[in-house]
């Protein structure tokens, strides 16, 4: 069995990528251009990718391919319907980034609520030192405590974000799927979540149904 990794450079060199069990031939390319994909995957039973796009036109040229394994959670770069029709399994790495994404979310949220970028610049360029009051009042800053956080997509990451948000003293609303009646008292109507939330966290996979889920309207 042969496995080909098309974009090894999307993972840090500090991360060891072990050869999967049962794989006799293993090839890892640092990066792969669109016009190199078919040639490199032609003899492969397994394709390992992170960001490389595999659409129907490509998959139809790979009769030996049995499995596409992503080194990430999102699978929107793979034509899953075409893969299914051709008998190719598609797998991802579920749950590996729950804590990391949760921490990153709150890092970005705190930075935005506290206008960290602006105030850091004000200290760096001397604005704060020259003010004379030893304080700045613009732009305004906001606390997380007491704010309402709407979560769209209540999987592992959504639930982890909920837990941390509650520790900050935030009110958390779980959004039911758009157009559906809330399945339990834990969930809130989708439109009500949008209307009542100070902050919204999108944690759902990118699919045709979720694309532009939150739009100008």
Language-model features, listed with the residues they occupy:
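Rossmann-like adenosine-cofactor binding region
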Residues: 54-59, 171, 177-217
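Phosphate-binding beta-alpha-beta segment of Rossmann-like dinucleotide-binding domains, i.e.
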Residues: 86, 94-148
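Glycine-rich Rossmann-fold phosphate-binding loop(s) that bind the pyrophosphate
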Residues: 154-155
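N-terminal glycine-/charge-rich "phosphate-binding" loop or analogous flexible N-terminal tail
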Residues: 1-44, 169-173
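N-terminal Rossmann-fold NAD(P) dinucleotide-binding loop
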Residues: 158-159
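A short, aliphatic-rich alpha-helical micro-motif
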Residues: 40-41, 59-62, 144, 193-195
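Short beta->alpha connector loops at strand-helix junctions that form conserved
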Residues: 30, 71-72, 88-99, 176
